UniProtKB/Swiss-Prot annotation:
Catalytic reaction list: diphospho-myo-inositol polyphosphate + H2O = myo-inositol polyphosphate + phosphate
InterPro entries named in the record: NUDIX_hydrolase-like_dom_sf, NUDIX_hydrolase_CS, NUDIX_hydrolase_dom, Nudix_hydrolase_domain
Span of the annotated motif Nudix box: 128-149
Positions with a binding annotation for Mg(2+): 134, 147, 169
Organism listed in the record: African swine fever virus (isolate Pig/Kenya/KEN-50/1950) (ASFV)
Name of protein: mRNA-decapping protein g5R
Catalytic residue positions: 143 (nucleophile)
Assembly information from the UniProt record: Interacts with host RPL23A.
Length: 246
């Protein structure tokens, strides 16, 4: 069993117009299933059940992209112009060995055609993988700024709150650890701009927005990742924090 850990920061504000607590969510540019397939994180077993499940969790456009058998386009969809040539060469060789050499992609296309429905691009809390020797909190702070553009001095960490969630995909366990922060007063305005112009944000994210609890519940009902068990307790913590603060 492989363990993959990501660290995130739930950052909240009190919307001064609606008088509701909101948090920042980001929508990824590609599905986890698509990324796992392109990076060859799968096993080829006799019935291919895990692969078909991966294809089920991809968007229709991602499945169509794989059916072109053009690995350069698949790789570019994730990495855009990031120069990772050594990793690209390694993954391309594995893709070619698995799918192109045996039958020029016929088996792969047949498996994709067995997929039913379509996955969605996840809305999630800004998070990422820690670097070597990086603490959990330092990782959460760095990833949050990379994905939102909001600097460390613009919010306050609430150290008493820390939550985690785990789920399994095939032989991989995904563990997410979350810290909590509240925005400074000057950034609570409803129309505070969230920009996608920063290079890292363009590469990883398609949308970024403030969401209240009603929106979080709606999003969670329409995607595989349920955010409510994490964001619900965070909002309750913020309510108590603001009550005692004032």
């Amino acid at each position: 069993m492989q363990l993959k850990t990501s660290i995130g920061l739930i950052t909240c504000r009190m919307n001064t117009q609606s008088n509701q607590i909101e948090t920042i969510l980001v929508q990824k540019r590609y599905s986890l299933a698509f990324s796992e397939f392109i990076h060859c994180h799968y096993s080829i077993n006799s019935n291919h059940s895990h692969l078909i499940k991966m294809f089920n969790n991809m968007t229709i456009n991602e499945r169509l992209l794989i059916k072109t058998l053009d690995f350069d386009r698949m790789w570019y969809h994730i990495w855009i112009e990031t120069p990772v040539y050594e990793l690209y060469h390694k993954k391309y060789q594995k893709f070619k060995k698995n799918w192109l050499i045996p039958d020029n992609g016929k088996k792969l296309i047949s498996l994709i055609n067995q997929a039913k429905g379509s996955g969605t691009l996840l809305w999630e809390i800004p998070k990422g993988k820690p670097k070597e020797n990086e603490s959990d909190l330092a990782c959460a702070i760095r990833e949050f700024e990379e994905e939102t553009g909001i600097a460390r001095e613009d919010y306050q960490i609430l150290p008493a709150f820390k939550k985690s969630m785990s789920y399994f995909e095939g032989k991989t366990e995904y563990k997410h650890i979350y810290f909590l922060a509240v925005l400074c007063k000057s950034l609570e305005e409803p129309n505070m701009n969230l920009s996608l112009q920063y290079e890292t944000r363009i590469a990883e994210i398609s949308k970024i927005s403030w969401q209240n609890m009603e929106a979080v519940r709606f999003i969670s009902k329409h995607q595989s990742l349920n955010l409510e068990p994490i964001i619900g307790p965070a909002f309750n913590f913020i309510k108590n924090y603001l009550r005692y603060k004032h």
